[in-house]
Design a protein with these regions (language model features):
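The feature marks the mature, well-folded catalytic cores of soluble enzymes
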Residues: 1-256
Length: 256
């Protein structure tokens, strides 16, 4: 595997497509509430715990297989993670949870140039999600990629606050962010502060990639992820999600 990418519009050569097998909704905790269910009570979230239905998993896997087949037809080399049990318990000295899924590799890996970053995802249940991709990562490393993992965080309860849902519920106590909080624009990295990424995440990213400019965006959207809000299609053309971005709050890097 050869790794090099600085944007999302160049021709695609290789890609990882996830899996839906054994997807599991973990027990509620502040990190899960922050990312998915900030407006629900813990009692309401508890009703969701457990495996996704066979129907959902089967249909999701069929979609992923169809996507993989189509990409291969177009000449793209496709990699798939291992199937793993996501209901296995994860225990630390401070909390316990289960896994979630390995459906979305774009959530947990950020490619910047020749580097692959295992990001410090905002959910406790994703702390070991990258393990199912280990064989792929070793192949990338053998091909010359720089592979490193962000510092493992403690995911303290104090890292999340739900007093004001009009603001990000992720606090700035630890280095936490998901890869889709970053929109890659060549040597500029547009970083969204939201429920899925805080300012310390941006500071850490800038310290690791001093040759790039990390541009922090606060105002566009406080929910999870930025790549469904701002989509650069090519140089000079960007697609905005009109439900989240307006002429008053769009990222100023896109001003003419």
């Amino acid at each position: 595997m050869r790794v090099f990418s600085v944007n999302d519009w160049e021709p695609l050569m290789e890609v990882i497509v996830g899996r839906a097998d054994f997807a599991y909704i973990p027990p509620p905790d502040p990190s899960m509430k922050n990312f998915r269910f900030a407006n629900l009570s813990y009692r309401e979230i508890s009703k969701l715990i457990g495996s996704y239905s066979d129907k959902v998993i089967s249909e999701a896997n069929q979609d992923l297989e169809d996507l993989s087949d189509k990409l291969k037809e177009l000449g793209v080399k496709v990699y798939r993670p291992k199937k793993v049990r996501h209901d296995a318990q994860i225990v630390t000295p401070y909390w316990k949870t289960t896994g979630w899924h390995n459906y979305c590799p774009r959530d947990i890996f950020l490619v910047i140039g020749t580097s692959i970053v295992e990001v410090p995802s905002v959910m406790r249940s994703r702390i070991f999600e990258t393990w199912s991709y280990n064989e792929i990562l070793h192949e990338a490393f053998a091909g010359g990629a720089k592979w490193f993992s962000a510092p493992k965080q403690m995911y303290n309860d104090s890292s999340f606050n739900f007093d004001d849902l009009s603001k990000p519920t992720l606090m700035n106590n630890e280095i936490l962010f998901d890869a889709p909080n970053v929109v890659r624009l060549g040597m500029n990295l547009l970083y969204q502060v939201s429920n899925s990424g805080n300012e310390k995440g941006a500071e850490w990213l800038q310290s690791m990639f001093p040759e790039y400019k990390v541009i922090v965006e606060h105002d566009a959207y406080s929910g999870a992820h930025f790549d469904s809000t701002v989509v650069p299609l090519r140089e000079g053309l960007v697609l905005f999600n009109g439900h989240r971005v307006s002429p008053d709050n769009y990222p100023k890097i896109f001003e003419k």
